[in-house]
Amino acid sequence: MWDWYTGILIWKTQNPWTSLRGQMYDWSLDVNASLYGTRKGCEPLHAYYNPVTRKAGLLNTTLKDYTDLSIVARIYNLEGKLLWEKETRASAKANTVQELLDIPVPEGIKGAYFLRLALNADVPNIYWLTTEPKDYTSLSQLPKSRPDIKTDIKKEGSNFVGTVRLSADSQISFFNRIKVFDKETGKRILPVHYSDNYITLMPGDQQEISLEFPANLPEERIQIVVDSYNSPLP
């Protein structure tokens, strides 16, 4: 990783015809999870996991040197129990990559589990890992969990801008997707520009997401909805 290839080339960001699968946004201008995953993986300075070597590393594609960086790695099972944790500190010279931590496979675990990598307490990278190659069906066994949601929306010029804060309880809140609706018609409001979406939170984690969209309706009709993979049905 990063020895032969140091970047990605995006061939098509959307479907040129409807039968082709694979896109970052669709014909309705709704953004898919692939965009946020790609953007996260392309952060110029971040902690990453190499599944081939099972090591966590530090990537710096900027032209600036960094010193005394903190990388914290944690492994959780599907029940949200912390199985393993390790912290290391490192420096990163400009345009370098280095592997720092061996990431173990937890004893006694079978199926899917989660690796959380955080650099300097910033928004972490969350990896879904599994002991069964290509088999993530055990994710369906995640305990039900609904994140706490706090919103703050206001009008600025011709747009609405604001934030959505998601907070997890004692369980993992998996693959949270934020959507904006018109209360009166029940229709999606599109396009909406989010700073992040399709968010996974480990127990006790929280994240604030900014959003912006055209002010084409009265503020009182705006409805923020968060769908989660393991959220109980209403």
Residue ranges of model-derived segments:
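Carbohydrate-binding surfaces of carbohydrate-active enzymes
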Residues: M1-D196, M202-L211, E219-I224, P232
